[in-house]
């Protein structure tokens, strides 16, 4: 989905189109029935997942009041009745397990969020995280190794977009984004 389709607001983050496409692919939602989107922002990941997989139940968690309003407006705009919005900050108490968890950031609670996400995944469930900070990348990778996550994969996405400049065009660079994906396997993720 094009980024321009989503309602946006100042200081409300959105997972961009190319990053979203890669993250959704790595979540392997074709075999999922429940996705948790932590720090849903505008809802771009939740909405694209819900539209691609209409039988998927999506739980979108967001703490920012401005983002919650945009998330709800975008959910209504795209008529996504399969998205439940949970106001609040993860880690939080929620019932049930998921087949996939997406984290678009950590809010300063990275290892606690990873543990929380793994605890809410069914065996075989997928966790996908995106970061722009190198420190978060290294901390996440080290913690995932420590807890025994399986099928770990990491990609750095560096995109540039063709942009007008005077009478010509140039490729305007975007910041690199790190995408980490892993899986919870039964008897492979140790209790902390």
From Swiss-Prot:
Question: In the Enzyme Commission scheme, what number(s) does this protein have?
Answer: 2.1.1.196
Note whether Flavoprotein occurs among the keywords: no
Q: Which reaction does it catalyse?
A: Co-precorrin-6B + S-adenosyl-L-methionine = Co-precorrin-7 + S-adenosyl-L-homocysteine + CO2
Give the GO terms filed under biological process for this record. cobalamin biosynthetic process; methylation
**Pfam families reported in the protein's UniProt record:** MTS
Give the matching InterPro entries.
Answer: Cbl_synth_MTase_CbiT (IPR014008), Cobalamin_biosynth_MTase (IPR050714), SAM-dependent_MTases_sf (IPR029063), Small_mtfrase_dom (IPR007848)
The molecular function terms of the Gene Ontology recorded here are: cobalt-precorrin-6B C5-methyltransferase activity; protein methyltransferase activity
State which pathway it belongs to.
Cofactor biosynthesis; adenosylcobalamin biosynthesis; cob(II)yrinate a,c-diamide from sirohydrochlorin (anaerobic route): step 8/10
Leader sequence range is: none
Q: Does the keyword S-adenosyl-L-methionine feature in the UniProt annotation?
A: yes
Family indicated by similarity: Belongs to the methyltransferase superfamily. Bacterial-type CbiT family.
Q: What is this protein called?
A: Cobalt-precorrin-6B C(15)-methyltransferase (decarboxylating)
Species this protein is from:
Salmonella typhi
What lineage, starting at the top, does this entry show? Bacteria, Pseudomonadati, Pseudomonadota, Gammaproteobacteria, Enterobacterales
């Amino acid at each position: 989905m094009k980024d321009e389709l989503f309602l946006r607001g100042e200081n409300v983050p959105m997972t961009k189109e190319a990053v979203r496409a890669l993250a959704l692919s790595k979540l392997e939602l074709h075999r999922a029935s429940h996705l948790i989107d932590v720090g849903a922002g505008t809802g771009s990941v939740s909405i694209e997942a819900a539209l691609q997989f209409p039988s998927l139940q999506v739980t979108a968690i967001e703490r920012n009041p401005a983002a919650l309003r945009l998330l709800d407006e975008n959910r209504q705009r795209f008529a996504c009745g399969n998205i439940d919005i949970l106001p609040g900050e993860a880690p939080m108490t929620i019932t049930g397990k998921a087949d996939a968890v997406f984290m678009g950031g950590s809010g300063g609670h990275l290892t606690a969020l990873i543990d929380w996400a793994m605890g809410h995944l069914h065996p075989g469930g997928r966790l996908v995280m995106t970061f722009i900070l190198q420190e978060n990348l290294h901390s996440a990778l080290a913690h995932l190794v420590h807890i025994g996550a399986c099928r770990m994969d990491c990609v750095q996405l560096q995109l540039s977009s063709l942009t007008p400049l005077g009478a010509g065009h140039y490729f305007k660079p975007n910041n690199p984004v790190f995408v980490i994906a892993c899986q919870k396997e039964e008897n492979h993720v140790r209790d902390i």
